[in-house]
Amino acid sequence: MAIRANPRLVEELEHYGAEDVAKCYHCGNCSAVCPFSREPFLFPRKSMRYLQMGLEEKLLGNLEPWLCYYCGECSEECPREAEPGETMMSMRRWLTSRYDFTGISKLFYRSWKAELAAILLVALLTGAGFLLFGFRWGGGHLGVYAGEGAFLTTGAVHVFDWILGCVLAAFLGINCARMWWFSIGKDRTLRIPPLAYLRQAFLLPVHFFTQKRYAECGKKRPWAIHLALMLSYTTMLVLIMFFLHAMHSERTVWAAHGFGYLATIGLLGTSIYALRGRIRKEETHYKHSHETDWIFLILLVFVAGTGILQNVLYRVFHLDVAANVVYVVHMMGVVPMLGLEVPFSKWAHLAYRPLAMYFSELQAEAIRERERAVAAAGAPLPA
């Protein structure tokens, strides 16, 4: 079957942050220095080749950009300064936009103004909705933060959280299914038995909760920052979805609040660290920043900061009116972050990375089995 090339693929990837792709002349230094570059995944060199040749379909089914954690060594060793690490990052953004069936990711990654406008619109609608509920339908009072007569009842907010969570899960689930189809499902040369999916399923929680592959890059600090950010966000999400009553209780529930404070500090600290790194540009993986990186980090700082402020206003200073106002402002950041960033932008990486580790192991196993079968039959390997 003929392979179609897209001559404008490099130009398209430039909208997602790719730089200096044409400088690459495939010396192989990047793949040689990468600790994860091994058969059948020889990156970044092979991915760079797909891009330069305009092999869009091969790039779409390629998991290698997700197997890269951008330690920066490939860019440091590149004699042509072709920035292979940053190109792999741009490929992840491009792949995210292709997995997304709605086209929202593509819009966001190609136009930071569109993403910012969407965030502001959702924030304003969220604020108006919560205020309308509190003043008109909730039956509470702005001067009451928790308990009987609360301006925003925990039960109503909890229902809203679950509805939003189900919508997000649906969008992200469909996009993850598309990721499977592009990388594994439509490849007729791969034969993956159902039992293999079950046998390798442990990779999903292992890589999600430990980010162990990043730790193997040899740079412990970036891994620790990344892990702290991911665990802090996951902890906060679990608290909001399952322990909101304890978080908003009139009495102090230290088990819930302890985890909440730790998660908030983790989000705030890691976000500020990443912002500082992108401003100073001292580390290789911080030298280049896409607009969506800035929006993502600023939104995280906003959400974490307002989360701490509304809790302090209520718990420490007993200023219920101020706490309610700040809580509405806080939700104006939370809803866009969950509703837009999780399924369509940066946060989607939390799902795609462990899935890529899972799918890549299934791919590698199937490829090895196929090669054994072909060798036994004495036939040439498929292209």
Protein language model features and the residues they cover:
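Membrane-interfacial loop-to-transmembrane-helix junctions in polytopic alpha-helical membrane proteins
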Residues: E14-D20, G61, T153-A156, Y214-A224, ...
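Ferredoxin-type iron-sulfur electron-transfer modules and their immediate structural context
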Residues: M1-P65, L350, Y358, A364-E365, ...
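Flexible metal-binding regulatory segments at protein termini and peripheral loops
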Residues: M1-A2, R92, T96, A383
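Secondary-structure capping and boundary motifs in well-ordered enzyme cores
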Residues: K23-H26, L60-L63, L67-Y70, Y261-T264, ...
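Iron-sulfur-cluster electron-transfer modules
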Residues: V21, R38, M48-H245, S249
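Hydrophobic alpha-helical transmembrane segments of multi-pass small-molecule transporters/permeases
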Residues: N29, V33, E73, E77, ...
